[in-house]
Every structure is written in C-alpha cells, then in structure tokens.
C-alpha cells in the first residue's frame, strides 16, 4: 500500500512518547456515474484530539459531456481532460461494446473522440492514468445521446435513375439532386446544410420540387472542364419537427465536352453541336402528335416534349412497350412491344433517341413516332457513341412542354423561375 509521508511530530520535554498521525486515502465521486479512485488507496482518518481531518489524493479527470448528461448531440464529441494527472488509456464504448476512436495529445492531458456518435445510445467512458503523486487513477462516466422523433436518409443523385457517384464525368447539362426518404418539414434548415463548390466559380441555385426532392443547377450550361463538388451535412441536424438527418452526403464530378443536339419538329432535322461548333445535321422523325383518353380515364399524347432534355442513361438494347403507358391491347394500332437498339433515355416518361430502321423514309420528312426521336442506323450509332449522361437534347416546335420534374427537366424554367424554388 502506498502511504503518503508522515506529518512531523512534536517532541515534548519530559515526555517519552511520540504521537504518529497517519494520513489516509479518501475517495470522491464526480456526479452519480463519474467514479474516482486511486488504485491501492484505503480510507480512514487521522487527527489530534478534538477533531478529524481527511486528505484527498491529487488528480482527477474531467468529462465532456458531463456525467449523466442526456439528449447529447451526436456531433458534440467526447473530451477527457486530466487535472493534476496524466491519461494512459481511454475506452469510449456504445451499448454493443464497440470502441469509438479518439486521439490523445502528446502531453497526455487531453483525449478527444474522432468518430461521430450514434443516436439514442448510452455511452460509457472509462479512463485510466496516473496522478501527480505517481499513483494509478481510474474514473468512469456515462451519458446518453439524443433520440430523434424520426430520421431521414438523403441520397445524392444524378437523376431519378442513377446515383451521382456512378460516373465521374457528365455533360454540360448535368444537375445535382438530393432525395430524402421522409418529407422535410423545414426546407430552409435543410438547404442551409447544402454546399456546392465549382471550379471555376459558377452561379447556381437550389430548387425544391417537393418536400422530398431538391435540385441544383447552374444558371447557364456548365462550362467544359468545370469541377462540381457537393456536400450535405445532415447528420445530427434537426430538419424540422424532430426529423434528423441519418447521414451526410457528398460527391463530385467533372464536366466533359459540350455536346448539344437541337431537334426541330418543323424541319424534321437535328443539328448537333460539339464545343459550340455544328458537326452534323441528322434527319429525324419526332412524335406524330395527337391525344387520347385511356379506359381508366387518363390521357396520353404522342408528341415529343419541347424543351431542353438531359441524357439520363444509355443502353445498347431497350425493351419498349406501349403497356408502359396503358395501351395493352395487341389489336390497338398504337400497341407495340419491341426490342429497340442504341437507345438513350432523355425523360422519365419514355422519350428516347434511338435507332429506327423501320421508318427511314420518314426521317427528315415526317413525324411518325410515338414520342421518341427516331434516327437512321448510321446516325444513331454515332449519336449513341458520342452522347453521354448530362448532355443536352433540346426539342423545338411542338405544342407540349417538358415538365421540370420529368427527368432533369429543370432547364425548362427561366433562371428567375428557378430561384423562386429556393427555400432561402
């Protein structure tokens, strides 16, 4: 047992006895769950006649969050600070016993966690070290993190069809979408947590299509070579009415060459521009037009939507069927179920540009399709090989317009209209 030095004793003339006073180690607590103990110590008292005194051994550890704290933010982090002592080891564990990582500074006086905490969990911090007297020192503390009413998981997407991370390069018309799996009550709070950085600097803004979807686009088409980086720091943040972010999102991409195709409904021709230069004029056949009401009361039309479409995805072969929009009777003259080659999807409602070798006489002369842009074999191969997701296919001269929510249809809106969709 380690015993502190004895106090000096007084020698009295004529008295042959000496009184020795022994100091005794004592224990104290820091809150209900922060326990202090010097290993090897005992308790007791010493003193002279008429009273007793207790001496506490030096050194202790201070905890942040405080012992027994509740509703702790998962972003606050955990700090252990040594006072009149040094830290040797720190164990921060969740209820499953998993260790949370942290760093101890060089002088062994401060330890800080380096991982985010989990929601609604009780954590235990166990610290061991040595006090300034060279004695072992141990303390523990417990705290509980906030338990949200509900959580929402955000997704960083290039479109309805694909996550942004699936590609590293996109065309000049690429936008950035954040999807939430729960409706966000406080859109402004969520939008403040979003950041887009571009190199070179590019003006852009966010537009809320719904409480579950917000989209960023630049004021003008992105310049080739631009790097776009986006982050959404939602984890640990209240997005309204106790709905907290379940995770952060981040991603980036680089803008490829400028590739823009402009299809004219009147001339039945499509001009293709690469980096601002017209490189090809392609005979096409667009949607034949007309509207009909289906048995369920819904209405469909066979126009190609006017406006700037963004290429969403490509496939060497795609099954296309009229059943996708309700025409299921094989006897119906508008029924079809075919395997189509060299397809590039440009809207959620089934618009593509693709090879169409069955109506070549109509290319450049008449609109006969069900809404797609029909192209001959040689030109469709070139378009398929040349155009990539994020490239622009603009349609002009039809009586129906693309919806902002149809694919990446936000380019249909003016910049002033787009800015009105911001929550800030």
Regions found by a protein language model. Name each.
Residues 89, 126, 193, 269, ...:
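Conserved beta-strand and immediately adjacent loop positions that scaffold enzyme active sites
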Residues 172, 303, 321-424:
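Exported/periplasmic cell-wall-interacting domains
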Residues 179, 183, 314-318, 382-386, ...:
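Structured segments of extracytoplasmic/periplasmic soluble domains
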Residues 214, 254-255, 262-265, 374-379:
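Short, glycine/acidic-rich beta->alpha junctions
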